[in-house]
Amino acid sequence: MKKALMIFAATFVAIAVAMPALAAVEFQYGGVFRTRWITSNNLNDGSSDVQDNNNMFDQRLRLYLTFKASENLKVVWKAEIGNVTWGSFKGGRMGADDVNVKTKNAYVQFNIPNTPTTAIIGIQGISLLNSWLVDDDFSAAAFVTKIDNFTITLAYIAGQNYPDSTGNETESYYSSTKDNVDDYAFAVTYDQKGMPIKGTLTGVFMNANMVPWAIYPEVMQSPVTSQAYPAGQTTTAALPGVFIGSTNYYSTAANPSTSIAGISWMGNKLDGVKNNQMFDLGFNLTYKIDWLSAYVNFAKNIGSVKTASRQVIGLKGTSTGTEAVYGSVIGGVPLIDVGQVQDLDYTGWMIDAGVNYFCGPYTFNMGGFYTSGQKTKDQRVYLYDSNGNITGSYVTQRYQSTDNVDFFTYPGTTSKYFSEIVGGGILDAAGPFASAAAGNNGSNFWRGYGFPSNLWTVTAGAAWQVLEKTKLSASYWYFQTSESVGTGRFNTDLSEKMSNDIGHEFNLYLTQGIVDGLTLDIVGAFLLTGDAYARNGYIGVTTAGTPYIVQWSKDNVYEVGARLQWDF
């Protein structure tokens, strides 16, 4: 921290010395400082059987520097120091020195002469459709045109430009686009002064080439490369980026290293990705008068991706004796059928609506949203004995359909906040079992904070402005999955218990102004968990192929904390 402050001090001195020569340049500054205390229990696993109590302090400082030549030209730099967790080895322990200054934004903004268009070029924040499409910092070029009551935005977002020289393809990796992700966006807003209605039509075209972006939501946090394996390539190894053996969004195993061949329990293996293109089209309508406001957001996934899906055609064991497990069968009998290359259509959709009523010091709100989920199917598979002979029995296995990409997905990174526990809220340092990181094998086939998918909710809340600087607010949320998800697998025949119930969440906030814009928020949240919040057991398999049952009891979740913040 001391090194960072010295850097900033030197920068300010240099600017001060240069100011006489730069008299035409106006210097502006601002920023946000926050520090938080967070404690929670059962947030990560929905159970008290394993210790997952979290108690921590963290802090973050963002500085906004603007160099303004005129109303027609300015350069903006936004830096971030943090997040720093108190007591950590990365700048939070005694001494506190660390290299933790990051660039959030760095762009030039200028008006194009003789046109009504403003250009913004560089690393910038872009939010579309109230965070339902994208909401993050991007390397991008945006052009905003204002004509009468219309505002038209066109943008190019460089999601990923990753040359790959390690693949099997012969062309020069310098010109290869197979690992590129490009987004092209537009937004047309109609807003007439004096009218209570405002509307926006938004579209984003994603061209992800051979990158599994949007198919697996966790990839959008940290895109991966195609590794040069086109759709239809056959291999038995789990290849980075290809997700042929998904142990991420579709997996329910607790430890991927103990699963055989990396086969997920309710998902099918994919043999690479090709021609991954999606178009999202959505709209927002808002209505606002003195005592009432209302809104609705809608978005639809359109497009397709070419891939190959592998089906489980055989299991090892018997339905009444030895546990049915995945694994190699003596004699070379294949348990996995290499699927044919096919086009999967993006069919997901979402809708979000709400209303707020203002009555003096009181505000009342209600609303909710729905995001589609991945449909599931039952398939009948053979059972083989240890010698590779069919036992004559079948079992029914539930798995996630790969006929289409049915769950609502996103063309770029976003950060959608809503409730405190499932939706990130103010204390977003940790997310729930199913959402903290989609790579978590307990993801249970739904997502909350960050990229809501296979999730719907209804909510109601109220706020009371007790004093000028004191506000109390509370909200209730009921969550379910749109498509049922697995809650546990214990039976020999691999049947899956299913549920939609995530739970009832209650949030309570006290907001207190302290001095000169410094604000303290005190937060309390409690979730009565349903069966779908997290799995309560599964059949594990050792590397030697020996099955074992893992089971834990379900418990409720709480989160308590505070945030001290100054916007300046």
Question: What is the meaning of each model-derived region?
Answer:
Residues 157-164:
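His/Asp/Glu-rich, glycine-adjacent segments
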Residues 167, 211-234, 238, 306-323, ...:
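Internal, charge-rich low-complexity segments
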Residues 127-133:
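A conserved hydrophobic secondary-structure block that centers on an alpha-helix together
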Residues 227-259, 381-452:
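Flexible glycine-rich, low-complexity coil/linker segments exposed to the extracellular/periplasmic environment
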Residues 202-206:
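A conserved mid-domain beta-alpha-beta active-site/ligand-binding segment of alpha/beta enzyme cores
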Residues 3-123, 134-135, 141-154, 168, ...:
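Beta-barrel outer-membrane channel/assembly domains of diderm bacteria
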Residues 365-377:
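Hard-cation-handling environments
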